């Protein structure tokens, strides 16, 4: 099928035409091959290299005998004898025959006068047109050269061009009948005037056949012009015609300023010569000097517009029944333009409208056609722009359709139809006439470089041109390349009252496509009975229901005299809609053809002539136990015209007539519905059900009959599904058929016939089965082969007031790590009257990693003691402090972690306190597992950054593979009486990251982690830090943290309980002696300094007389004597004592001898005698 690209509409003002064109394409059915006969195309071939087919024209002569001709121009045909040239071109006439090489050259240009002319490469046949049946023909040679002063120094050559007008029998008679036309001959020479006129590049006749119109695009420095000449000389109505001729620049004035084409930028003064002379007359081509140039607003800005490159005419363009002329200027203003001209009384063509192209170098105006597409009495304009292109949309070539709005062209927005890239779509246009006899003219558009070439046929209509082509002729089908370079239509050459189409090419071949007569068929279908009552069997056996069908056909055609006998093959298809849904038809035809299926019946009717009505009949019966009682049985009638087989046609045989064809714009199918008598649907016999999905939610399957709803997201509408090894998931569904308004129960809620639930599953879920809590409610569910679509039968019918709850079991095997959401689409369906909308149930999918992490420290209590020692003095780990070992265990109960991403086991190690002093010094980090069989992990960064010597016993144990020895647990003494700070002032502290300690993170990658991994970390307390900073602390808690991190591209990965905390308590060793690390000489100096201060103090006191004893008289000095109380009297003394000894009594007591001492009691007071005085002691 040919690709038919289409452009958008250009500008918004023409909204009426935009809408009407769309409606025309919408309501008229498509037709890829309509009534141009491709199989019976007539080919004609010319001389190789002659460009046979460059121009074509259909012609029909009436005198002296009727004959149809295919006129083909070959502008590179070899010269005739006597033409004094190699290639001159020519016009060929081909009869309507099956012979491909029976064309002959029309004798119109013999001989040559080389002193006045040159016919070498004159391109005779560059254009050819016919007036129609019994009319004249014009053909031109636009490169015909007129010469003067041949072989002299002042020789001139002017490419003026010329045309020939032939009689209807292809003969040239006197000038009154036709003859040779050279209007540029004898005019001013040079390419700025008429020296390169190129008359005949385009030529045509006016539709009333009174005028001959020429285009001369080389006039006035290729600005171009158009000329209208009277061609009806000698006719009886000559007196009623204007004399003419008429010319765009004025036939008498010859003023290029009167030519209205837009300007372009071909500027400057140009001299082209091959003569070394200062004589300006010897310049072959020149532009005017600035002083001699024409004055006016345009000047020579209007050069090179090529006005007259295409030409046409028509009535009703500007005013009703007034003839106007249209000329194309494809290079005007670099975009192209089209000018509508009218003739005035002064032999001039006056411009009335100038239509400009929209794109640079599009060639707008390269081709033209004038016709009334919508039959409104106003001629419309079709313009080709074959060089148009849209790079992004891949479009090439365009045709603009201007629909005439009562002679007003200012606000018309044209319809633009585009072709394929580089197709030259629009290089040729032709008005075909009424090709299908629908009352509207049609057009053809050539695209010679779309593949081997194509011709697009567009029909007219009351709404304008139909933008979708009714037929596409392809050069490949007839074996012609560059097919469609030239076109000619609008004339019936085979006598069947339908216009035909002649297509030329650049491949020296042309082809005629004859139009096939169009038949308009009428058909009727009669059904008995019109409604099916399943309770009333009427078949012959008395058990089943039968239906009689009668079909009748007739046809009409244009013209009414065309009345062939035709055969129509028809086919009846029963229960079409059900069959198209993939269901078994409910009908069986009792009479059917050998090749018919059970639900089909075919036949043939013969229509002998127009209006002949012929009928056929058949019977079908319904199947037993019909379930679908609400949907009508659709019977589809399709028919087609039986085409006689094409026999092999040999040259010399008489040209066969073309077979008729059915109207492609008339549907050839008809549908008829046969309804059932409806029961149980209320008094109005209309079943208005009210099926509703009351509940639909995802569930986890606990057991075969027990389900639990999944938790919901925050929105309350989306479930959360954790992908953790669940092979199945449930979908709970509850469907009801209850009245929507209990106060009006008859309004709806009727029985739902063929009630179904249609389930569409995503690619990640597959249907597995159905469960119901009540086996009676369990529906029948069937799925397709891929288990992605499920149909559940809810009942036929599902009764009023019914409710059913069931669970769909869905397999989760298709859920992958990339699955983030589950969406199941649900749609209730019934053939009862109810509008039902689809419903979606969704669930977010997340992958929960079943990882667990735990840790333990050995020992869990540590003590610090010893002496303060600097970092630089440390040599071995044993000098640091007590050893501690941390063991972190990670377990994985799910799939291997490397399928989900990369994981790391991290331990946050508090190695320093806030001021930067060492806290817990890491010695060694080892990872077992998580790396594959027999591999140990490498963690970073490396511990033991001070490179301290490792305990030799530990190294030896690791080399022998022996386990760590279990150290006895250390006990904390409860007594803290020796602590230098009182118990009330002691406090507890916690050293943790990142508040009170600085941490280093040891990260260990876990590769191929599928079971368990253990991380061992050995460290030692830094005694010096604790002795210096935490002597006043009652207890210290050192926290080590560990966690797991996973890096993955999976967005829905969830990791829970992936961290742990390992505390260790630290105390000051109560049995340790704190020895200050002070040098001995400092102590010695301190002792000496103390002695010196003491000596100075004694000397000072001595000088002050502190050590001199005061001397008093004996009478004034009290004497104290110690009295010894016998032991046996002491108890009596204590019993008689009535009070405490007063301080005044310690002054009257005297010591009894120099060697006597008072007795000290247990509380270090003197022991008293019976008299209350201290008891002296004896030696």
Curated annotation (Swiss-Prot):
Ca(2+) 1 binds at residues 372, 374, 376, 380. PROSITE patterns: FG_GAP, INTEGRIN_ALPHA. The chain crosses the membrane at residues 1077-1102. A motif (GFFKR motif) lies at residues 1105-1109. Disulfide bonds join 94-103, 140-163, 184-197, 539-546, 552-615, 681-687, 781-792, 939-993, 999-1004. It comes from the Eukaryota. GO terms for molecular function: metal ion binding. ADP-ribosylated on at least two sites of the extracellular domain in skeletal myotubes (in vitro). No proteolytic cleavage to produce the 70 kDa form is seen due to the presence of a Gly instead of an arginine residue at position 647. Residues 1-33 form the signal peptide. Its main location: membrane. Ca(2+) 2 binds at residues 434, 436, 438, 442. Ca(2+) 3 binds at residues 492, 494, 496, 498, 500. PANTHER family: INTEGRIN ALPHA, INTEGRIN ALPHA-7. Belongs to the integrin alpha chain family. This is Integrin alpha-7. It comes from Mus musculus. The lineage of its organism: Eukaryota, Metazoa, Chordata, Craniata, Vertebrata. The gene is Itga7.
């Amino acid at each position: 099928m040919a690709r038919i690209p289409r452009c958008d509409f250009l500008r918004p003002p023409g909204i009426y035409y935009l809408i009407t064109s769309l409606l025309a394409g919408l309501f008229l059915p498509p037709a890829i091959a309509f009534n141009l006969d491709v199989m019976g195309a007539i080919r004609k071939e010319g001389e190789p290299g002659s460009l046979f087919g460059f121009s074509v024209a259909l012609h029909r002569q009436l005198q002296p005998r009727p004959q149809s001709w295919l006129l083909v121009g070959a502008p590179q045909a070899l010269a005739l004898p006597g033409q004094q040239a190699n290639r001159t071109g020519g016009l060929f006439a081909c009869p309507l025959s099956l012979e491909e090489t029976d064309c002959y050259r029309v004798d119109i240009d013999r001989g040559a006068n080389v002193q006045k002319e040159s016919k070498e490469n004159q391109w005779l046949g560059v254009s050819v047109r016919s007036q129609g049946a019994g009319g004249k023909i014009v053909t031109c040679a636009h490169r015909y050269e007129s010469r003067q002063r041949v072989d002299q120094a002042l020789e001139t050559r002017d490419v003026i061009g010329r045309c020939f007008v032939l009689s209807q029998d292809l003969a040239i008679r006197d000038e009154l009948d036709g003859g040779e036309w050279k209007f540029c001959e004898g005019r001013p020479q040079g390419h700025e005037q008429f020296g390169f006129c190129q008359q005949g590049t385009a030529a045509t006749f006016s539709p009333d056949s009174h005028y001959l119109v020429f285009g001369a695009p080389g006039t006035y420095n290729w600005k171009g012009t158009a000329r209208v000449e009277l061609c009806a000389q000698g006719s009886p109505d000559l007196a009623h015609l204007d004399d003419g001729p008429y010319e765009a620049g004025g036939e008498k004035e010859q003023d290029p300023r009167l030519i209205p084409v837009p300007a372009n930028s071909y500027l400057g003064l140009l001299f082209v010569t091959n003569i070394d002379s200062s004589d300006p007359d010897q310049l072959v081509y020149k532009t005017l000097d600035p002083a001699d140039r024409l004055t006016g607003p345009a000047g020579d800005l209007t050069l090179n517009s090529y006005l007259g490159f295409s030409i046409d005419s028509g009535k009703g363009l500007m005013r009703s029944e007034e003839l106007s002329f249209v000329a194309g200027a494809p290079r005007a203003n670099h975009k192209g333009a089209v000018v509508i001209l009218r003739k005035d009384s002064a032999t001039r063509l006056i411009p009335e409208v100038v239509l400009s192209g929209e794109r640079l170098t599009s060639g707008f105006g390269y081709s033209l056609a004038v016709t009334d597409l919508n039959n409104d009495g106003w001629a419309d304009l079709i313009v080709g722009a074959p060089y148009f292109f849209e790079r992004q949309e891949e479009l090439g070539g365009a045709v603009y359709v201007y629909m005439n709005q009562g002679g007003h062209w200012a606000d018309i927005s044209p319809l633009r139809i585009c072709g394929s890239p580089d197709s030259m779509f629009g290089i040729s246009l032709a008005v075909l006439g009424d090709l299908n006899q629908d009352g509207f003219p049609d057009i053809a558009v050539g695209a010679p470089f779309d593949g081997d070439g194509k011709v697009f046929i567009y029909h007219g209509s009351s709404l304008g041109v139909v933008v979708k082509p009714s037929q596409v002729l392809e050069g490949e089908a007839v074996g012609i390349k560059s097919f469609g370079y030239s076109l000619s239509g609008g004339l019936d050459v085979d006598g069947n009252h339908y216009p035909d189409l002649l297509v030329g090419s650049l491949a020296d071949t042309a082809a005629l496509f004859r139009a096939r007569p169009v038949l308009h068929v009428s058909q009727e279908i009669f059904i008995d009975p019109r409604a099916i009552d399943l309770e009333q069997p009427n078949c012959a056996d008395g058990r089943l229901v039968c239906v009689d069908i009668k079909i009748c056909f007739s046809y009409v055609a244009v013209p009414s005299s065309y009345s062939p006998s035709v055969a129509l093959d028809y086919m009846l298809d029963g229960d079409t809609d059900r069959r198209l849904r993939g269901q078994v038809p409910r009908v069986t035809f009792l009479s059917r053809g050998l090749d018919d299926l059970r639900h089909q019946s075919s036949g043939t009717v013969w229509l002998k002539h127009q209006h002949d009505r012929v009928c056929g009949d058949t019977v079908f019966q319904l199947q037993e136990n019909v379930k679908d009682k609400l949907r009508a049985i659709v019977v589809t009638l399709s028919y087609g015209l039986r085409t006689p087989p094409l026999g092999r046609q040999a040259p010399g045989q008489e040209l066969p007539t073309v077979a008729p064809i059915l109207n492609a714009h008339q549907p050839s199918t008809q549908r008829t519905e046969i309804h059932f008598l409806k029961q149980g649907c209320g008094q109005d016999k209309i079943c208005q059900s009210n099926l509703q999905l009351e509940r639909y939610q995802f569930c986890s399957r606990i057991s075969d009959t027990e389900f639990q709803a999944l938790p919901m997201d925050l929105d309350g509408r989306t479930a959360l599904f954790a992908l953790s090894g669940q092979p199945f998931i449930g979908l709970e569904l509850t469907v009801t058929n209850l009245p929507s308004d209990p106060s009006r129960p008859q309004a709806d809620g009727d029985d739902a016939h063929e009630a179904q639930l249609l389930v569409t599953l995503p690619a990640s879920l597959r249907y597995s089965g159905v469960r119901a809590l009540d086996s009676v409610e369990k529906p029948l569910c069937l799925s397709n082969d891929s288990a992605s679509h499920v149909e559940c039968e809810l009942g036929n019918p599902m009764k009023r007031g019914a409710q059913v709850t069931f669970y769909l079991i869905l397999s989760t095997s298709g859920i992958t790590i990339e699955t983030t959401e589950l969406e199941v689409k649900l749609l209730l369906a019934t053939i009862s009257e109810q509008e039902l909308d689809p419903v979606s149930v969704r669930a977010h999918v997340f992958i929960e990693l079943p990882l667990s992490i735990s840790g333990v420290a050995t020992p869990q209590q540590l003590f610090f003691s010893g002496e303060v020692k600097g970092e630089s003095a440390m040599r071995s780990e044993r000098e640091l402090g007590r050893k501690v070992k941390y063991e972190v265990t990670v377990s994985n109960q799910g799939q291997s972690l490397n399928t989900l991403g990369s994981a790391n086991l991290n331990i946050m190690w508090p190695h320093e306190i806030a001021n930067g002093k060492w806290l817990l010094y890491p010695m060694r980090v080892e990872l077992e597992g998580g790396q594959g069989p027999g591999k140990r992990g490498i963690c970073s960064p490396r511990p033991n950054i001070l490179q301290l010597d490792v305990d030799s016993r530990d190294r030896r144990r690791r080399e022998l593979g022996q386990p760590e020895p279990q150290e006895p647990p250390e006990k904390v003494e409860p007594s803290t009486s020796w602590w230098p700070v009182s118990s009330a002032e002691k406090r507890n502290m916690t050293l943790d990251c990142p508040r009170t300690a600085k941490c280093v993170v040891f990260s260990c990658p876990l590769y191929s982690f599928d079971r368990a991994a253990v991380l061992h970390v050995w460290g030692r307390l830094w005694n010096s830090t604790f002795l210096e900073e935490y002597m006043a602390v009652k207890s210290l808690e050192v926290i080590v943290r560990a966690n797991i991190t996973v890096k993955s591209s999976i967005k829905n990965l969830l990791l829970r309980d992936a961290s742990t905390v390992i505390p260790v308590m630290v105390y000051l060793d109560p049995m340790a002696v704190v020895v200050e690390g002070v040098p001995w000489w400092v102590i010695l100096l301190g002792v000496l300094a103390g002695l010196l201060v003491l000596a100075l103090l004694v000397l000072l006191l001595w000088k002050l007389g502190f050590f001199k004893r005061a001397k008093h008289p004996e009478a004034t000095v009290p004497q104290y004597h110690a009295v010894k109380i016998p032991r046996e009297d002491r108890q009596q003394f204590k019993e008689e004592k009535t009070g405490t000894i007063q301080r005044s009594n310690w002054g009257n007591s005297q010591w009894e001898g120099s060697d006597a001492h008072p007795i000290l009691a247990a509380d270090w007071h003197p022991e008293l005698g019976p008299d209350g005085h201290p008891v002296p002691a004896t030696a």
